[in-house]
Regions:
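Auxiliary Fe-S-binding modules of radical SAM enzymes
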Residues: 1-21, 38-42, 160-163, 174, ...
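N-terminal [4Fe-4S]-dependent radical SAM core
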Residues: 1-81, 89
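General N-terminal targeting signals
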Residues: 25, 30, 43-46, 99-101, ...
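Small/flexible residues
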Residues: 35, 39, 53-54, 58, ...
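Solvent-exposed, non-transmembrane amphipathic alpha-helical segments
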Residues: 39, 46-49, 104, 127, ...
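Short alpha-helical interface elements
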Residues: 44, 50-55, 128, 132, ...
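Conserved AdoMet/S-adenosylmethionine-binding subsite of the radical SAM
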Residues: 64-219
């Protein structure tokens, strides 16, 4: 719903809010902190989505759809890359397929924008999008998050999804993913965790991914080293920045 400082996109759009902690990559999720802040400010959409645990905001597991937000992309006349649901997961089990279909309709009717949808639940993405009534949209990039080798199976699920562009976000990268199969994955984003309690990202893990991308023809985007002060840590790798974007496949 707003312009964003996220390096690989231009704006965020949140027709859904709230989520459930799923795997290790969720532990320090920035969206939990942001949702708690918005809840404290009295923003109705975020009421009841987080709770305090050990002094930190955690998801309650409650998910809210926001039909009013469906009109937002049409108001944007300037074409932009749009990160869909930076504050949730469109393919959370509690998001009705009918609502996902409404989101799809909005994307189809605003082809000037490029939509980037990221999920930790690619198995549901595949199940919903292969029902036969979700067209493959050339302006919809579909991706999954992979934080370590324990969840590499998400890439196999993503490959089942019919998509113009498939991508993987390896952020927060908290372990090696050496040996990952990037076949038919068009774009890889790599980033270290940032903020309180950020876990260290080993440079070797990043270089492994960059080499895998070269072998598979996958565009490589290095987002950040992360840490408590991500700006100070920067986003250069081996003396340069990597801002590659995928080429359209259909």
């Amino acid at each position: 719903m707003a312009e964003t400082s996220i390096e690989w996109t231009d704006a965020t759009w949140n027709p859904v809010a709230g989520c459930t902690i799923l795997t290790a990559g969720c532990t320090n999720c920035y969206a939990m902190r942001m949702a708690a802040r918005l809840e404290a400010m009295g923003t109705e959409k975020y009421q009841g989505l987080t709770r305090k645990s050990g002094g930190r905001a955690k998801w309650t597991g409650k998910v809210k759809i926001d039909p009013k937000s469906l009109a937002i992309p049409e108001r944007w006349s300037k074409p932009r890359r749009v990160f869909v649901n930076s504050m949730s997961d469109l393919f959370h089990v509690d998001v009705p397929a009918d609502f996902i279909r409404q989101v799809w309709t909005v994307m189809a009717e605003t082809p000037r924008h490029t939509y980037q949808i990221l999920t930790k639940r690619p198995e549901r993405m595949a199940e919903v999008l292969t029902r036969g009534d979700f067209p493959v949209l050339s302006n919809a990039w579909l991706g999954t998050s992979v934080e370590d080798s324990y969840v590499l199976g998400r890439l196999d699920e993503l490959r089942k999804v019919p998509a113009a562009i498939r991508f993987v976000s390896l952020e927060p990268l908290i372990g090696s993913v050496a040996g990952a199969d990037l076949t038919n994955i068009h774009w890889a984003i790599v980033g270290g965790e940032s903020g309180p309690g950020a876990r260290h990202m080993n440079p070797r893990w990043v270089n492994e991914i960059e080499m895998m991308c070269r072998r598979s023809g996958t565009a490589f985007f290095f987002k950040q080293w992360g840490g408590r002060n991500k700006k100070a840590a920067g986003r250069t790798l081996n003396g340069r920045t990597y801002d590659e974007m995928p080429a359209a496949s259909i």
